[in-house]
Swiss-Prot record:
Coiled-coil annotated residue ranges, if any: none
Similarity comment text for this entry: Belongs to the ENY2 family.
PANTHER family named in the record: ENHANCER OF YELLOW 2 TRANSCRIPTION FACTOR
Species this protein is from: Yarrowia lipolytica (strain CLIB 122 / E 150)
Subunit and interaction comment: Component of the nuclear pore complex (NPC)-associated TREX-2 complex (transcription and export complex 2), composed of at least SUS1, SAC3, THP1, SEM1, and CDC31. TREX-2 contains 2 SUS1 chains. The TREX-2 complex interacts with the nucleoporin NUP1. Component of the 1.8 MDa SAGA transcription coactivator-HAT complex. SAGA is built of 5 distinct domains with specialized functions. Within the SAGA complex, SUS1, SGF11, SGF73 and UBP8 form an additional subcomplex of SAGA called the DUB module (deubiquitination module). Interacts directly with THP1, SAC3, SGF11, and with the RNA polymerase II.
Name of the protein this chain belongs to: Transcription and mRNA export factor SUS1
Function per UniProt: Involved in mRNA export coupled transcription activation by association with both the TREX-2 and the SAGA complexes. At the promoters, SAGA is required for recruitment of the basal transcription machinery. It influences RNA polymerase II transcriptional activity through different activities such as TBP interaction and promoter selectivity, interaction with transcription activators, and chromatin modification through histone acetylation and deubiquitination.
Gene giving rise to this polypeptide: SUS1
Length: 91
């Protein structure tokens, strides 16, 4: 997906109000799966290894692992929700 397509999809989601609904749904699913707790523990562990904690370096270390920790069913469900929205928007 190109940056322009991604930007266009996001704009349509925001304009329709679906972005907020999707965001809330994802947050709830992540919370229920324990993802926030896992990422928090990961960030704390990484921060304890650094003499001076800088957000940019912490994000650089934790973000790829945090993305990997998202359950596959949440990823699939999210993509299906976006695809469903796009099908309706393109009709």
């Amino acid at each position: 997906m190109t940056d322009q397509v991604r930007s266009d999809v996001q704009e349509k989601l925001v304009q329709s109000g679906e972005y907020e609904k999707l965001s809330q749904h994802i947050q709830a699913r992540l919370r229920n799966s324990g993802w926030y707790d896992k990422v928090s523990a990961l960030a704390q562990e990484e921060a304890s290894k650094q003499d001076k904690v800088e957000l940019s370096s912490l994000l650089e270390k934790v973000q790829p692992q945090a993305c990997d920790l998202v359950d596959d069913d949440i990823k699939v469900e999210t993509l299906k929700m976006i695809a469903s929205f796009l099908e309706g928007a393109l009709k």
